Design a protein with these regions (language model features):
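P-loop NTP-binding/switch modules centered on Walker-like glycine-rich loops
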Residues: 1-74
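Charged, flexible cofactor/metal-binding loops and thiol motifs
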Residues: 47-132
Length: 132
């Protein structure tokens, strides 16, 4: 089915939005990716660039938790802790409680989500872009 969607997309020059946790599908089907955590975009850019050089800790964790059929076997990563409750408004860095390498700025929860340029057409949350 995905191949048929891709054919129609290419034939008609359509843009499509895929929402998925399936990293393999995203890698195959998209040119640009937006990674979201707790309802906010934490990294966005060309799929190849984001996969090759992730700049946000959550993106890195997603990639490290994905099995590969190529190369040597590796232990898949999982994140400690629980995702934040989305019932109440989140202020500051929503990922810091689960981040393996949070900065002091992230931990103090006084930051707001702000995407900064980290590469050509590649942007990541300012708070966590130094945590990878």
């Amino acid at each position: 089915i995905l191949n048929e969607i891709k054919k129609v997309q290419d034939l008609l020059g359509l843009s499509l939005i895929y929402i998925s946790h399936d990293i393999a599908v995203i890698a195959e089907m998209t040119d640009k990716i937006a990674v979201m955590y707790a309802g906010s975009i934490v990294e966005i850019g060309p799929t190849k660039d984001v996969f090759k050089t992730p700049k946000h800790s959550y993106t890195r964790a997603l990639l490290d938790s994905t099995p590969s059929i190529r190369g040597e076997k590796k232990k898949l990563r999982s994140l400690d802790g629980e995702p934040p409750s989305l019932i109440n408004e989140i202020t500051g860095c929503s990922f810091s409680p689960r981040c393996p390498t949070p900065t002091e700025k992230c931990k103090n929860q006084s930051v707001e989500m702000n995407l900064i340029k980290v590469g050509e057409n590649h942007f990541a949350d300012e708070c966590c872009s130094g945590c990878v």
